[in-house]
């Protein structure tokens, strides 16, 4: 059983610095590693002892390393048997007294979590773009079938229920592509903080693609259920997208907690001001006015679209 998944801080793999400080010695293992059976270079996250410069206390913190199989001590298990993405080589990787040069630390010692988040953000962003292609392929298959298939003397495309399914598929595709372009635009402009957008894009894309593939099979009926059509494979392959790169459940918690944290920071000065409200009317009044406007359905800032009901 895995010791860590969504809980990245529970990593057990360790890397201890050598006595002369020239390298780290890595021991432990990782499971479910993509390309683990033949990869020559790995990005490995491991617990390392880090001394706090202020207190002098030593604590374990995650550090990212670039590990090469040629270092020695790197082995792997047999490929895993999976529900989907079977063409992807997924295997356990084991590390036994692997000597990693100190120059192979990614970022800084103890800064592995930041590196992991950067990698995950990129992966989540790319998911929206990749799954847009999957959805488009499914929509084409469902549409072609609806145009050609005749039942009860009518083409499937002429039934309102089928039209609704096709419309729903295209709506989700459009939204997924729009989110992918938005996140890509933020990245191109050099934005450093796009983790919320990447998380939301990953959730929406993975769940929309699953829905579109499922509805495609439904439109095709028995034909879609057969392996020859290929959509059962698409559905199996899509299931992992709601799990890896951060499960959708964890990402929902992340989005909610980040939003609450942001609101908490906004309310912090108000909390302090309320201890002496008459002396801090300048701080309290704008917030109170904004809350009153919200209750009345008025925008917080000027808008041409608002009109009293």
Region spans (language model):
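Active-site beta-strand/loop segments that form the cofactor-binding cradle
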Residues: 1-4, 29-31, 35-37, 147, ...
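Short Gly/Pro-enriched turn/cap motifs at secondary-structure boundaries
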Residues: 2-6, 32-35, 55-56, 82-89
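A short core secondary-structure module
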Residues: 23-76
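Flavin-dependent oxidoreductase catalytic core characteristic
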Residues: 10, 16-23, 59-64, 87-94, ...
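Short structured motifs
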Residues: 11, 77-80
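Cysteine-centered functional microenvironments
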Residues: 1-2, 10-12, 27-30, 195
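Structured loops at beta-to-helix junctions and adjacent beta-edge loops in soluble globular domains
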Residues: 2, 47, 68-70, 79, ...
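Short beta-strand or tight-loop elements
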Residues: 9-11, 40, 72, 162
């Amino acid at each position: 059983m895995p010791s860590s998944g969504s809980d990245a801080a529970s990593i057990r793999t360790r890397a201890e610095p050598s006595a002369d400080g020239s390298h780290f010695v890595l021991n432990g293992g990782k499971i479910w590693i993509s390309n683990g059976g033949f990869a020559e270079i790995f990005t490995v996250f491991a617990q390392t002892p880090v001394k706090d410069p202020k207190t002098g206390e030593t604590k374990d913190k995650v550090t990212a390393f670039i590990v090469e199989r040629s270092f020695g001590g790197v082995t792997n298990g047999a490929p895993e048997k999976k529900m989907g993405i079977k063409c992807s080589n997924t295997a356990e990787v084991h590390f036994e007294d692997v000597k990693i040069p100190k120059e192979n630390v990614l970022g800084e010692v103890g800064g592995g979590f930041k590196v992991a988040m950067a990698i995950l953000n990129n992966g989540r962003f790319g998911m929206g773009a990749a799954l847009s292609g999957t959805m488009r392929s499914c929509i084409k298959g469902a549409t072609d079938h609806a145009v050609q298939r005749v039942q009860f003397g009518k083409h499937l495309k002429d039934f309102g229920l089928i039209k609704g399914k096709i419309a729903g598929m295209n709506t989700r595709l459009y939204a997924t592509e729009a989110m992918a372009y938005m996140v890509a635009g933020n990245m191109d402009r050099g934005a450093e903080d796009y983790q919320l957008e990447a998380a939301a894009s990953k959730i929406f894309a993975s769940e929309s693609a699953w829905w579109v593939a499922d509805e495609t099979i439904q439109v095709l009926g028995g034909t879609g259920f057969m392996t020859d059509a290929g959509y059962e494979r698409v559905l199996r392959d899509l299931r992992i997208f709601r799990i890896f790169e951060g499960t959708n459940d964890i990402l929902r918690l992340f989005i909610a907690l980040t939003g609450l944290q942001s609101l908490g920071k906004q309310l912090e000065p108000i909390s302090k001001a309320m201890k002496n409200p008459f002396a801090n009317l300048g701080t309290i009044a704008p917030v109170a006015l904004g809350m009153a406007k919200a209750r009345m359905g008025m925008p917080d800032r000027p808008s041409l679209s608002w009109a009293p009901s």
